[in-house]
Every structure is written in C-alpha cells, then in structure tokens.
C-alpha cells in the first residue's frame, strides 16, 4: 500500500490534484465499514475507523506531509478533532486564537485549519462565524463531529479540591454537575482545557475539567468521567482550506447570505428550500459589520453545489438575497469520539 500511495502521490502532483481528498477518503471508509458489518465478531466500529484513519494518514504523508493548524494548545478539543480527521501523520501547528487559524491558512503557512463551528449545548461559535465574514474566500472542505467527554482530574483527592479550572464553555457544560459535586470549589475560567490541566498539575488543591488525553499528558488522575450535564454534548468543527471537495452523494453545503431589510424577506428566502425540496439543516443569524441593524445569515443544507438540483435551487435563492457566498460543499460527517 505504501508503494502504491507513493506512486499515486506522483501522479497527483503531475496532474495538479489535491493530496487531501475528503470525498475519496469517505468512500474508502464507507467500503471498509460495509465489509466490517458482515462480521459480527469483528473489532468495534470505532476501532476500525481509527485504524484506517491512520493508514490513510500515513499514505497521505508519503505523498506530502500536510501542515494543519488548530486552536491550541496541544490536546485541546480542537486538536482532538484535527487528529480525528487527519490522523497523526501530519504536522500539527497549535495557535492561540480562531483568528490565527484563519490567518495561517489564508497566508499559505498551513494547508488546512480546524475551527469549532457549533456546540450542541452552547450553540454557535461566534469567533468562527465572524472570521468567515472577514475571510469569505476560505473554503470548508470537510467537517468533524466530535462527542465531547469532560472529565474532572487532579493530583489531590476529590474532597481536597478548592479550585476547578477550565475554559468558559467547558465550565458552562458541566455547571450543574460541578455545583452538586464540588460545591465549595471556586470555578475559574482559563483559555483552554489544556491550560486547566497544566494548572491542576502544579497547584495544590486544584482540579481541571478536560479531556482524557490531557490527563495523560499532565499526569493527572481522572476522579470522575463524563461529567457534562448533557449526555449528547457534541461540537461540530470545520476544516478550512483553499480546495473544493468533490461530491460523494451524501453531502452538505454551507452558505453565508444577506437579505433585503424588508418585511418577509427571510421567509421568502427560506421558502426556496421548501419549493425545491432541499432540506435546510441549520440556520444562524449574525450581526453585520457593514450596516447597523442588518444581519448576515449562515445556513447548512443537504446536497452538493455540483448537484443539478442544488444549482437550480441556488439560482432561485440568489434572486431573494442581496448577497450569497457558498462557503463549501463537503461530506456529511458521522459523530465520533
């Protein structure tokens, strides 16, 4: 396989084709999982996915070592999402903000970036939507849906915890549990779950809410697992870059659009999806930076920009809007983690 991957890489380079092909990788994985389903006593599905993720990652690296930037530091949930999508055989570059992720990709310092878009508990990630407004040339070429598992970790015993560190979103997602189980601890917000784990490592009486991987990295003991208030806590991430993704037949498209500031304009725009029998999966409004009291809308719908049905729908949709930007079409991700 390694030899074949190297030859494929040469052909791709000669033809100017993309090394990272989400559509092709989804096709390979779907075939593997279909074959796997025929063996009832085989490995767990998540194990099979992880193994083939690394095989594809290693094969990609033989063609070109990709550079992927993410909202750090190491072992943040953005890092875990990046590993889930690209495997370990890439050069990961942590940066300090979502803005920096976009800038690194835009300047060509990284091939791809991984940014959070939406959490099932806390909703949209405003910084990410804001950067799409600032850099609409960025293309979403893949998505990752990561099940978020928050854990309470420390070097001390649970009864000795006086302070709990984590990022604001993690504290928010575990607030009820923390209130019941660590009522005397001071909840302290920091920049990331990894920073929280680092502080818990060196500060007596401190604990952190973070991932299992962060506990291993900083030598902390997990006192309680899965402490998030919602069992279905999930974050959706976007992979941004400069390349478009081919259709797979199981895709979604993300739009950014502006509508006239008049009664019924949003209803008229949304009606286009219904009349063309296109499933609208997500819509979010965001204050415009151009005009006061005007909003930019983001939307996900099922289908690919290259589908004739979608092309027809977008023509009608454009007629109802003052501006439409297609941020990308990409395979619909299955939840992992």
Task: Label every PLM stretch briefly.
Residues 1-337:
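Domain-level signature for soluble enzymes in the chorismate/prephenate branch of the shikimate pathway
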